Design a protein with these regions (language model features):
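Walker A/P-loop nucleotide-binding motif
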Residues: 45-67
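Short amphipathic alpha-helical interface segments
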Residues: 271-295
């Protein structure tokens, strides 16, 4: 349910929200056409190529996929956010619910897979697993292997590079046979186009000048979600001071608020070990990988092994919380946000 809000500057807050269906998919024509090409056979009940959609946060991955599925594949597609549904059972229940079946508590995972198999025998279906890296590690191979075994078409969405899949069982990787499609960060001019489009829908005419849209875009780090949050914050801040239009001071305060909120949301995606590692790094801002791992091991009795630590750091870099400089034993990690 959308929050009801109407002010002298913002007349409709919905276009500034993440869930708002876009009126136009800006600067993603290539990705849209490529995805449509690989999904189109499903409309004729033919198999599709499994897709791996990747790129930094706020680059339009989820927005574009949901738009395509809802507009062209509504009857045969299920979308699952794996940050909310992390286990095999939760994912299967969510998929089956989409196709009209409510799972019983007494049913085992094997029963749910059989029920899904009954559906796939009647029609070719597509399942999108958004934030696929958030699936519980012990369940990841099970759910992916068995879904492919049922001839389900899969769309996997992640912030992380395709190399994250190296942690899967080789048999699962081979079965998936994924085609990778990258969503790079938006360029400044692309963010400005998106910002102006949403500005025209959300703000009273003349209250959010083009120059302020550009300023917000310059501080958005290629992230359209961050841009919209900055614009929303700026509009509300301007209204709070009874201004007639958004000015530089409103945008800059909006930037600070938006980045604080983004950081808190990203930290929610970390497990307890990752949060400890991040906290250690945050204190020094920059640490050699070896020193960071040793400090973590001293603080945590049941610490993870070096290989898992590297995977955790890879994940935090993919989220944009940290960045890695250098390779192997010379690697240094830095805090980004």
């Amino acid at each position: 349910m959308h929050e009801e809000y109407e002010g002298v500057i913002i007349h409709n807050v919905e276009p500034l929200e993440e869930a708002f269906p876009p009126t136009r998919l800006w600067h993603r024509d290539g990705q849209r056409d490529e995805i449509a090409f690989y999904l189109k056979p499903a409309l004729k009940n033919r198999p599709i190529r499994n897709l791996y959609i990747y790129g930094p946060p706020g680059t339009g991955k989820t927005c574009l996929i949901k738009w395509i599925l809802e507009n062209y594949f509504e009857e045969i597609a299920a979308y699952v956010n794996c940050f909310r549904f992390r286990t095999t059972r939760e994912i299967l229940k969510e998929v089956l619910f989409k196709f009209g079946y409510i799972a019983k508590e007494s049913e085992q995972n094997s029963d749910l897979f059989k029920k899904l198999e009954e559906i796939t025998k009647k029609k070719r279906i597509i399942i999108c697993l958004d934030e696929v890296d958030q699936i519980k590690e012990s369940d990841k191979d099970e759910v992916l292997y068995n879904l492919v075994d049922l001839r389900v078409g899969l769309i996997l969405i992640s912030n992380r590079l395709p190399t994250q899949l190296y942690t899967l069982d080789p048999r699962t990787r081979d079965r998936l046979n994924l085609h990778d499609i990258e969503f790079p960060e938006y360029k400044l001019n692309e963010l400005i186009d998106i910002g102006i489009d949403r500005r025209n829908l959300a703000f009273v005419p003349g209250t959010f000048p083009d120059s302020m849209v550009q300023l917000a875009a310059e501080h958005s780090e290629g992230d359209a979600r961050l841009l919209l949050l900055i614009m929303r914050n700026a509009g509300r801040i301007a209204e709070q001071r009874n201004a007639k239009k958004v000015e530089e001071q409103d945008v800059m305060k909006g930037v600070l608020e938006a980045k604080r909120l983004r950081k808190s949301k990203l930290l929610e995606k970390l497990n307890e070990h990752q949060k400890i590692i991040y906290s250690i790094l945050e204190q020094k801002r920059r640490m050699p990988a070896g020193e960071l791992f040793r400090t973590y091991c001293k603080q945590v009795k049941n610490h993870v092994e070096a290989r898992t630590f590297r995977l955790y750091m890879f994940h935090m870099c993919a989220l944009g919380l940290t960045k890695a400089i250098g390779a192997k034993k010379w690697r240094v990690y830095e805090i980004v946000i």
